């Protein structure tokens, strides 16, 4: 996503004469020699603030833009919180951007955004028209389920305007080719053509020339039918070739596994989510567990159907029992809670800074007071196991629990 952000920022940075840089942890806290826009991942930010003594300020830092706050995890939260703490005496302005959430007030308070500067919109409030439809299934997660989903997926493609690009999200890389085969088979039977989804105005010679450039010739059977794939397991040159063909309209359908929804760099007139369950191996090869897609993943997939150039369609295929939950939050906005005490991120940070300078209990409480967790503990204490809305008391309890869990460096606290 950082590369996508850089691509989007490049034209604007050139207009204002600013240098655009994708920063690593070593250079992030240094003062730039010229007007600079720095793009950094949450993990890199936290690394930069964890591997050395925290600076009291960052010279020249005037604006921090936090994108995709709906994806706020413990690493993202702690990194931004520490950055807020060390810039509190500066005139640094924090701006947050997020998909629609059902209550953005605490997010705004966390970033010290004034109420007058807070803009909140419903998921339906967008300039671009987006049609959302859903279809439920009662077939268990299996090959039969995806064959059943191939029918409505094909019809959504077939009855859309000619040439409309299509993105299809499936649960795993292994499901990509079988889904493509099901779609091509449906296309051959229903449309009585051996060209699949290739537009009638595109010559076989042109497609053949592109197919000859594929390093993996097993992809030819799909690309020659207008279906491509995108995920890191595909050879980079083949991946870029298929992206290029997709952008030019030479192939119409791009199939993407769910884990790649964050990095797929294209949008489409039609986005289809074929299933919202995935299988994860637990505790060995013999134990498999079925999980549901997260709400943030689904929102990310839906966002690929929002285009500046025209209308979009979003088709959700899921199990019947999951539809109500997904529909509710797609309509009302995402719920937001802190994940900071559910993971080891906070413990790892304390251990890291302990190696560089003395840290006491109050220092940790001060750091926690700048977190989104502090806002939510005061607003929704029961979610975090507290009965009172006293922020200071609850944060002190969290630190005590943290010390007990860490044990080994507990003597560093007083």
Predicted regions and their residues:
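C-terminal accessory/connector segments of nucleic-acid motor ATPases
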Residues: 235-245, 334-414
């Amino acid at each position: 996503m950082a590369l996508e952000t850089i691509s989007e920022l490049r034209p604007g940075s050139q207009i204002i004469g600013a240098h655009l840089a994708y920063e690593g942890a070593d250079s992030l806290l240094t003062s730039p020699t010229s007007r600079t826009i720095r793009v950094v991942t949450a993990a890199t930010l936290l690394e930069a603030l964890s591997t050395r003594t925290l600076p009291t300020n960052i010279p020249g830092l005037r604006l921090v833009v936090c994108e995709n706050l709906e994806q706020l995890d413990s690493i993202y939260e702690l990194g931004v919180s520490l950055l807020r703490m060390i810039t509190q005496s500066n005139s640094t302005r924090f701006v947050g951007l997020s998909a629609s959430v059902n209550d953005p007030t605490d997010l705004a308070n966390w970033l010290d955004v004034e109420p007058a500067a807070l803009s909140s919109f419903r998921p339906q409030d967008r300039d671009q028209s987006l049609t959302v439809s859903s279809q439920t299934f009662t077939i268990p997660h299996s090959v039969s389920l995806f064959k059943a989903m191939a029918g409505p997926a094909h019809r959504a493609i077939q009855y859309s305007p000619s040439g409309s690009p299509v993105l299809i999200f499936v649960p795993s890389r292994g499901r990509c080719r079988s889904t493509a085969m099901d779609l091509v088979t449906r296309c051959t039977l229903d449309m009585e053509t051996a060209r699949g989804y290739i537009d009638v105005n595109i010559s076989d010679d042109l497609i053949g020339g592109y197919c000859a450039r594929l390093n993996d010739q097993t992809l030819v059977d799909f690309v020659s039918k207008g279906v491509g794939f995108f995920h890191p397991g595909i050879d980079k040159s083949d991946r870029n070739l298929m992206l290029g063909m997709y952008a030019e309209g030479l192939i119409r359908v791009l199939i993407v596994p769910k884990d790649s929804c964050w990095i797929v760099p294209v949008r489409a007139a039609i986005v289809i989510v074929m299933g919202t369950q995935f299988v994860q191996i637990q505790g060995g090869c013999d134990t498999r567990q079925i999980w549901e897609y997260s709400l943030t993943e689904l929102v990310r997939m839906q966002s690929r159907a929002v285009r500046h150039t025209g209308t979009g369609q979003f088709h959700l295929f899921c199990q019947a029992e999951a539809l109500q939950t997904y529909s509710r939050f797609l309509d009302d906005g995402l719920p937001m809670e802190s994940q900071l005490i559910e993971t080891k991120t906070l413990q790892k940070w304390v251990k890291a800074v302990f190696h560089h300078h003395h840290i006491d209990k109050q220092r940790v409480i001060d750091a926690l007071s700048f977190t989104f967790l502090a806002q939510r503990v005061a607003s929704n204490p029961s979610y975090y196991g507290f009965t009172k809305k006293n922020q200071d008391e609850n944060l002190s309890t969290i630190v005590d629990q943290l010390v007990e869990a860490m044990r080994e460096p507990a003597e560093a606290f007083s």
